[in-house]
């Protein structure tokens, strides 16, 4: 479910990204389970000249207690859409954990290539993710 929040837009891109990820990890305002584990923090971010953002998270991103295909889809889709939809200068993202590119968070979604909002429609495609 899409949720709107107001964050200050000033400052460095890395700081603004960190604020967005912190809000995402805080969970929905209406209650419910956060899309990413609450201990998730963005350690570093780098934007290349072509609009690819490299996002380096702490191990908290891998800390899902009951990993499954939907939980992983929700986490990755939420990260991608939160970043790409709110930062026009970012077209795609790559997810890293502790400075290392990860193949997948829990074995379900391939993270070896850059991801964009086009990869994650607002609702899962019928019959799978």
Which role does the model predict for each range below?
Residues 1-129:
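Bimodal "functional hotspot" detector
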């Amino acid at each position: 479910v899409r949720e709107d929040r107001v964050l200050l837009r000033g400052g460095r891109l890395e700081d603004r990204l960190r604020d967005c990820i912190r809000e995402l990890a805080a969970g929905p305002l209406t209650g419910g389970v956060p899309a990413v584990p609450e201990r998730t923090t963005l350690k570093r971010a780098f934007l290349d000249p072509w609009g690819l953002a490299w996002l380096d998270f702490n191990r908290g991103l891998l800390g899902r207690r009951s990993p499954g295909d939907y939980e992983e889809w929700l986490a990755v889709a939420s990260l991608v859409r939160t970043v790409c939809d709110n930062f026009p200068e970012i077209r795609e993202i790559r997810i890293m954990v502790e400075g290392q590119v990860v193949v997948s968070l829990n074995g379900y979604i391939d993270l070896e290539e850059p991801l964009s909002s086009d990869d994650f429609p607002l609702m899962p495609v019928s019959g799978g993710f």
